[in-house]
Amino acid sequence: MRNDVLTLTNPMEENELEQILGGGNGVLKTISHECNMNTWQFLFTCC
């Protein structure tokens, strides 16, 4: 039963979580291009 629950919840691995949250190398990969997280943070906090 535990294996069924884990399959249903689809747990993330640590490297996947770091990539989504912008950890690790600080680059967020998107479909069209790669954006540096610092660029996004600047755009949302500059004003």
From Swiss-Prot:
User: Subcellular localization, per the record?
Assistant: Secreted
Q: Where is this cross-link: Lanthionine (Ser-Cys)?
A: 32-46
Q: Any signal peptide, and if so, which residues?
A: 1-23
Keyword terms of this UniProt record: Antibiotic, Antimicrobial, Bacteriocin, Lantibiotic, Secreted, Signal, Thioether bond
Q: How is it modified after translation?
A: Maturation of lantibiotics involves the enzymatic conversion of Thr, and Ser into dehydrated AA and the formation of thioether bonds with cysteine. This is followed by membrane translocation and cleavage of the modified precursor.
**KW 4Fe-4S (keyword) present:** no
> What does the entry give for GO biological process?
defense response to Gram-positive bacterium; killing of cells of another organism; positive regulation of biosynthetic process of antibacterial peptides active against Gram-positive bacteria
Q: Which residues form the Beta-methyllanthionine (Thr-Cys) crosslink?
A: 30-35, 45-47
Keyword Hydrolase recorded: no
At the top level, the lineage of the source is: Bacteria
Pfam families for the chain: L_biotic_typeA
List the GO cellular component terms: extracellular region
Q: Which residues carry this modification: 2,3-didehydrobutyrine?
A: 30, 39
Q: Name one GO molecular function term.
A: signaling receptor binding
* Cited function: Lanthionine-containing peptide antibiotic (lantibiotic) active on Gram-positive bacteria. The bactericidal activity of lantibiotics is based on depolarization of energized bacterial cytoplasmic membranes, initiated by the formation of aqueous transmembrane pores. Ruminococcin A is a broad spectrum bacteriocin exhibiting activity against a wide range of pathogenic clostridia and B.longum.
Similarity annotation: Belongs to the type A lantibiotic family.
Q: What is this protein called?
A: Ruminococcin-A
Organism of provenance: Blautia hansenii
The gene designation is: rumA1
